[in-house]
From Swiss-Prot:
Keyword entries, A-Z: Cell inner membrane, Cell membrane, Magnesium, Membrane, Transferase, Transmembrane, Transmembrane helix, Ubiquinone biosynthesis
Pfam families xref list: UbiA
Lineage per the UniProt record: Bacteria, Pseudomonadati, Pseudomonadota, Gammaproteobacteria, Pseudomonadales
Sequence similarity: Belongs to the UbiA prenyltransferase family.
Membrane topology: Multi-pass membrane protein
TM ranges: 28-48, 52-72, 102-122, 123-140, 146-166, 169-189, 219-239, 241-261, 275-295
Cofactor dependence: Mg(2+)
Gene: ubiA
Protein name: 4-hydroxybenzoate octaprenyltransferase
One record GO biological process: ubiquinone biosynthetic process
Catalytic reaction(s) noted: all-trans-octaprenyl diphosphate + 4-hydroxybenzoate = 4-hydroxy-3-(all-trans-octaprenyl)benzoate + diphosphate
Localization (cell): Cell inner membrane
Length: 296
């Protein structure tokens, strides 16, 4: 229904559809991958009963900041996307949206996100500036380092410490275990994503962990996912989570094993499906957290 409504917008206003494509709200996978770990932190911080105010702020913030991240990413890549098969039709490349319009939209989305943060507390407000800096600089990292996925992981995980300070006013040390776990997981799944474009990236000189890891890519991804699960298990013990949480981790581990097997030939479609599949791992962990608190 969600996608049907968006597609009807294309028929009613092709111009509006250009901005839908720029923000990629028609492709919710990025929202899911940002939403689930944010909700892990929200639920754990709230001990299973987070305030509706916190839930609303962080869910809305995920939608807005993911859209903002897509806009600034396409702005940064506007001169190289035309050389990559997957991105050659993006609105900034085709000229359907101008660079100025993209920057204005980015500013609007970031401003709306900041308005949400103003309804939290001073610690969370200060932390939000770190998240903005990471989101803004990530798209440019692939020009200078083979580790842009690490910066993306840092950006995608920044909502987790913010969730703790917003909900409790404090930032326990164990919250950083969640942060590290999500950073490792993000590097893993975004390397699958980068493997889709690796041949094009090698031709145009774009850097990524997929390029850096080479033939060791899948083994390194699986290792990162294993380390992420280890950090989550340790965080679970610190936050006194129980059996349902660990069942969620087992489901996530099964997801990771399937991804490793399905990408054994490194076909583009298989790598992209493995990237998409990580949404289910994140959801499984979230449902494990919810069930663990609800069924005590």
């Amino acid at each position: 229904m969600y996608l049907s409504l968006l597609k009807s917008l294309n028929r009613l206003s092709p111009r509006a559809w250009d901005f839908v494509q720029l923000t990629r709200i028609d492709k919710p996978i990025g929202i899911y991958l940002l939403l689930w770990p944010t909700l892990w932190a929200v639920w754990i911080a709230g001990k299973g009963s987070p305030s509706l105010n916190t839930v609303f702020i962080f869910v809305a913030g995920v939608f807005l900041m993911r859209a903002a991240g897509c806009v600034i990413n396409d702005f940064a890549d506007r001169k190289v996307d035309g050389h990559v098969k997957r991105t050659e039709q993006r609105p900034l490349v085709s000229g359907k949206v101008s660079s100025r319009e993209a920057l204005v939209l980015f500013a609007v989305l970031v401003s709306l996100s900041f308005v949400l943060v103003l309804f939290t507390n001073s610690t969370t407000i200060w932390l939000s500036f770190g998240g903005l800096a990471l989101a803004a600089c990530y798209p440019f990292m692939k020009r200078y380092t083979y580790y842009p996925q690490v910066v993306l992981g840092a950006a995608f995980s920044w909502g987790m410490p913010m969730a703790f300070t917003a909900e409790t006013g404090e930032l326990p040390a164990a919250a950083w275990l969640l942060y590290i776990a999500n950073l490792l997981w993000t590097v893993g799944y975004d390397t699958y994503y980068a493997m889709v474009d690796r041949d094009d990236d090698l031709k145009i000189g774009v850097k990524s962990t997929a390029v850096l890891f080479g033939d060791a890519d899948r083994v390194i991804i699986l290792s990162l996912q294993g380390l992420a699960l280890g950090c989550l298990a340790l965080a679970g013990s610190r936050f006194e989570l129980g059996a349902f949480f660990y069942m969620g981790l087992l489901v996530a581990a099964a997801c990771f094993a399937w991804e490793f097997w399905s990408t054994r030939l490194r076909e583009r479609d298989a790598c992209f499906k493995a990237f998409l599949h990580n949404h289910w791992a994140g959801l499984a962990i979230f449902l494990g957290i919810v069930a663990d608190y609800a069924l005590r």
